[in-house]
């Protein structure tokens, strides 16, 4: 009988050890001539590994990005998804720990005129589940996959948010530059109209020439108003990203913007492995395989 019990325990442990869930490893074999020649790995950091503060050095833009990371509703929702997945993962890890049960008891007994006797007991029992077929292990792997996927989603939302704020900011700088040029052009045409009218009064130009100059002047005025409207629309878009009321945002000048003078884009395969959507797809496949083995 004792021998049979030992044999049964040994079989159970062997089944639990081998498991039916194999670790997924993505294929990384790349043909040598895929990129038309030998790829040399450089020590310089790729663009995808740079911190956004190193790429965007404008203090006004950095301030806007920091505000967006604190107030944007999509990013906050992604943060909550990460916290939820982390709690699920912790629950899956705790399933491997033994469960303790505490059942305190007390009795009072008395015989005839003798003093009552009080008896107390504090039994503690421990139990745990043998993961014979890998169910608990697969659940833990699923929780890990969901946590990694939620983290990749958060990173993707964060990247899109930073890129959106930066793109909107530089659009404002570009429109500011165009507006400044248009206003200078407006002043130049205003002087041209005045000069042409003076020439007409002196008999050196006709009414047709004045009308042509005025038409060009009014056209430039219209472009100034159009640029001002575009700036208001872009500021509204920026306010939407920052989850705040639209306002006139303080900003720098396009001509003074500085970017890294030299950076590497990185090896294509490494760039793909750094993309949150690619990592999320790989994790989704891992989650699916874990679900199918249950």
PLM region descriptions:
Residues 67-76, 83-98, 111-112, 125-142, ...:
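A glycine-/polar-enriched beta->alpha junction
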Residues 2-8, 15-70, 228-273, 279:
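Terminal intrinsically disordered/low-complexity segments used for targeting and assembly
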Residues 287-294:
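Single conserved hydrophobic/aromatic residue that forms the stacking wall/gate
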Residues 282-283:
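Acidic, proline/serine/threonine- and glycine-rich low-complexity intrinsically disordered segments
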Residues 109-113, 249:
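A short, acidic/glycine-rich surface segment
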